[in-house]
Amino acid sequence: MNVPHPTRRRALATLGGAAAIAAAPAFLRTVNAQGLVKLSYQCGWLAQAEQGGLYQALATGIYREHGLDVEIRPGGPQVNVMQLFLAGQSDFAEADSFRGFAFAQEKLPAVAVAAFFQKDPRVLMSHPGVGNDSLEALKGKPLLVATAGRQTYWLWLKTRFGFTDEQLRAYTFSLAPFLVDKQVSTQGFLTSEPFAARKAGVDPVIHVLADKGFDNYQNVVVTSPKMVREKPEIVQKFVTATAKGWASYLHADPAPANALIRAANPAMGEDLIAYAIGAMNKYGVVETADTQATMIGAMTHQRWKGFYDTMVAAGAQPAGTEIRNGYTLQFVGKPA
């Protein structure tokens, strides 16, 4: 059975040596004829529902209401997001907690300013009815895990659940090996792979890693320390407007954003977009107690430190990093 891998795939590339070519951010260079500040946001992947808040803020005029003219740039498998950002090619870019740790460790000119996915949508999927109804039950059983995941969440799974490397099987960016073997579980993303599995006739058991303590922030917005220092009001406007975009996308009519998403990425079907929106709402990917206390995009020192300590214990991060150098709570302490 040859089942194509669904559109969704997060692929933030390695930082490499991009810091050496860091340039002035674009915001210092451009204001349009209407007096709006021109900004760019570099996504980690092709246009999809997981960027819906950005596209909704653009499509419904929320950014313009905040004095911003925002360009959303899709990513993809050949796009090195961090290299582009550190070279000054975008004002904001998509990252995660691991990037924030790297910013601090490597003293890179980048800082996280908001986290629009409170839950990392990473999952493991299993077949129903074969005794694999919990993560604990997967110990000793075959798992399809990509190379990148073996350096992050796999180390955590080994520490948390006693998994071993003998369980690992190659992940080929296809669901076919999973679909043909009921004893195999596979990595995936909450917003796509379960949908694809159901389309192929399997209603999977979904193990959400975040629900078991994998507290990685995703859809983290990063910008330059220069932007934070010299134009904090612009950063605040972007964060606030994007938070409003997410609230609108999840709880009002998402059609304006969806039209832009499908125009930028025709492979995104309406049914997959609808599924992804439903999953984000059902599993609390964007909205949690932290966002209710402050705003969508919230971050806390406790969450950053707790996840860092967990990753140090798992051997996924070196000890001794001053992680607060990689993020700031300056822009996420106020209701949007």
Task: Show which residues each predicted segment covers.
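Secretory targeting signals
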Residues: 1-6
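Structured segments of extracytoplasmic/periplasmic soluble domains
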Residues: 57-60, 66, 84, 88, ...
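Pocket-lining segment of extracytoplasmic ligand-binding domains
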Residues: 98-99, 173-267
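Short, surface-exposed acidic
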Residues: 163-168, 265-278, 317-325
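Secondary-structure end/capping motifs
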Residues: 229-314
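Conserved C-terminal helix/tail region of periplasmic/extracytoplasmic solute-binding proteins
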Residues: 301-336
